[in-house]
Amino acid sequence: MEITLTDIEKEAYKDSPVHRLDSRVKLLATILIIIFAVSLPRVHEDNLIRLAVVELYLVILMALASLNPAYIIVRFLAVLPFGLGIIVIQPFVRQPFFDSFTVYPLDLPFGLTITYEGLTFGITLLAKFIVCISAIILLSSATKMHDIVGAARQLGIPKEIALLLTMMVRYLFLFWSVLKRIRTAQKCRLFNIWNKKVHRKWILEQIGYTISSIFIMAYEQGERTYISMLCRGYGQNGNMKINKKDLKIPDILFSGTTVLVIVGSYILS
């Protein structure tokens, strides 16, 4: 299953109790969950219980949002290698914040040893990583990208950063569209990056040409976009239009429930 930017935006346009929540509330809840997960002790016997409670809460929210399970799994697996590379080496590393280590009696090659403390720390890192990624996937899947930027602007981020985020979101879709056209043209010419019958150097040259073409097209598009913005009155004092809404009862209930889950998971464990 292939997930594209368009698929992400389609999920965000669904109608569910989670989708109808105020974007500011969802953004703050995501930030709060990430801060909670990151701020937990490096190693503690109750860490996994606390994180499991929060993860269960996120899974329930995903179910209420009617998100496609296959879509969630594919997005999660796409990000997993970035954190897994750091997590896997932890059992073999002696972290400086431990005073002593308990070595497992395993005969490993290259003189490697696995410590109980390193393994515990690695498992804790994995649990934190899963919770943080789940929160981000839920936010991006249940909230339109423009609404996320608008919520961040209302919460006080500088307008310059909000403008950059807005432009980045637009250019992501433009970049994907350009890349698809280039890939379609290459396929029509029977170009296959994994073709073993073609010299690898030639394939790398074609990849370099593709990257160069995208860079030049992005530069030209940026110039055209900037000129269009100036023609529409863009300047130093320009502001981003934000549709301000008052918080409703579901938003308040969601905020309270999120805080209760986080505080409860910490106190009861």
Residue ranges and their predicted role:
Residues 25, 49-50, 158-162:
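Membrane-interface starts of transmembrane alpha-helices
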Residues 53-60, 146-151:
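Hydrophobic transmembrane alpha-helix segments characteristic of membrane transport
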Residues 69-81, 251-255:
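Alpha-helical transmembrane segments and their helix-start/interface "positive-inside/aromatic belt" motifs
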